[in-house]
Amino acid sequence: MLHVSAMSRQPAREAWTVDRLINERSIALGYSLDTSSFGAYTSALNSYLTFCNLHHLPVDPTPDTLSFFVVFLSSHIAPKSVNSYLSGICRQLEPFFPEVRQNRKSLLVSRTVAGCLRRFGTPTKRKAPFSYADLQRVLDSLPSTPSHDDLLFSAILLTGFHALMRLGELVFPDKRVLRNYRKISLRHSVQVSIVPPQFSFFLPSHKGDRTFEGNTIVVQRINRPTDPFSRFLSYLTSRDGLFPLHPELWLTSRGSVPTRHWFISRLRVIFPSKDYAGHSLRSGGATSLAEAGVDLALIQAIGRWSSSAFKIYIRKNPVVLHAALVGRPAHQLLD
């Protein structure tokens, strides 16, 4: 039998009851998945259960049943989305069917997915990235004496573009059940520096933060009319004058955190086309950095991406991007 070493200096701690251990573990498991992800996974499970009921199949996720589900769903939605559905199904059914992940990786299921991608696959339609000309168009549309909400809108737009931020990191979701105050940036975390001219604030949590440590967002002044530094300072002055005691960094004229609908509705006034949306901020900033010759590893770090998937945000054909960087076509030799 193993015993605690006599040299050990373990602090004295009160023992927990079994009920408390179970309760605390349940709470920890609840925090393991974000609310928005839980909603998506539950939706995927509901689709699977509906499929099983419709076809009188057992719920047991065998390779046969999963492959049938893939074929059926791929004829109704984009096959690329089916993989996400399978991930959600595995996450929700694993406590009841421990072998579900192994079945998901089986040759039958993986080949069925590959076949559906080839049979039903369609080109991916991505939102257009913002350019500096687009940003200038937004600023030109603002009145000479902008309101607080005008200042907020421009500050969010320019900050999101230059810091490669997701719109969801700057505003609240439209659904109240998905809103989490632990994810929003607070006013007291803001630091403004004159030398060098830049501002920063703390982002408590984001999609790529696997350790839940948060990140400090830093945005520097640039010599362009679309400089984010001056716009942020103008917004901050207005915000502090109206709501000096409110803790949230981003606040509308009503004293509430802006929602996605609040931002998109203002964006639609300037860009009626649905080619532009929240992703246009992040993809526009990433494309701008790539055009400036910034190393891809640095772009990944600035955007806080946890994998190489960030490359899809650089919305520029590699041939065109190379020509822009070196000033000549890719196959043209130097004279």
Which positions does each model-derived feature cover?
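Extended, non-catalytic subsegments within catalytic or DNA/protein-binding/adaptor domains
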Residues: 1-335
